[in-house]
Structure formats: structure tokens, C-alpha cells
Amino acid sequence: ITAQSWLVANYDGTVISSENANEVRSIASITKLLTVITVLDAKQPLDDQINQYTRKELIQLALIKSDNRSAQVLCEKYPGGHRECIIAINSKIAQLGLTKTKIIEPTGLSVFNVSTATELIKIVQLASTYPEIVEASKTSQIKIQIRIRTLKQ
């Protein structure tokens, strides 16, 4: 393994092997897991139309294609908007007892979205309890039909 920090664990979280697992590192697109978890916890209808997509399709695009714009829109359409979404993400992190994980934006583009390999295991374990995330993790490609609205003047 050539990664600077890593951790191998059983499904139950038992660590098999690791190196520098408690070092804080930028987590890039893994951020999208926390964004989607937070959006799903808000219990907004998955079939709500947001621009040309449903909320479920935006979740799929964020997870399967790692689409930054989809993650951003999901956060913007969170109850209370973007700011409340980021607050809710960090509240979820605190509930999980994660002290080294910090998120400042929903896509993973910021190097200031950070965590450790040890804390990421807990995030992945939580993510595995959401059927929508499990479904997306088993999917390598998606086909989404864009809906175009006709506007009359």
C-alpha cells in the first residue's frame, strides 16, 4: 500500500491493519457521503423536482458520478439552504463523536474538508445503513433523462 495513511477493517469496524490512521488528511469526494447522509436525514421527498432532476437523481449523480454540482444543489435545496446544510453535516459529525473530521463545503473540492482513516470507517459504516447509498455503491453507471420545462408567456 502506497497511501500516506490507510486502514483496513472488518465490516464491524475491527481494525486489521493500518498506518498513520489518525493523521488528518483532506478527504476530497468522500465529503459527498456526508452531504448525502445529511440530505437523506432531512427526509425531503426524493421525487421532488429540482431543476431538471429529482432529488434522488441528484443523489445518484453525486455518489455514482461524483458530480460536484449535484452535491452543491442538494446542499442549496436543504431546509434552510447551504449554510444550514453545512451546519447539519458538522452536527452529524459531532453526533458520531468524530473530533478530527471537519467539513466546510459539500463537494469535497476544498482541502479544508478533512478527516482521518479511523474516522472515515465510522462514516462509511453509517453510510452503509442508508439503502439509497448502498444502491448507489453497487451501480457503476446511470442513465437519467433530463426533463425540460416549456415556459409560456
Question: In which residue ranges do the predicted regions lie?
Answer:
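Conserved catalytic neighborhood of penicillin-recognizing serine enzymes
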Residues: 47-78, 150-153
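A glycine-rich, coil/turn loop motif that links secondary-structure elements
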Residues: 21-26, 51-52, 106-114
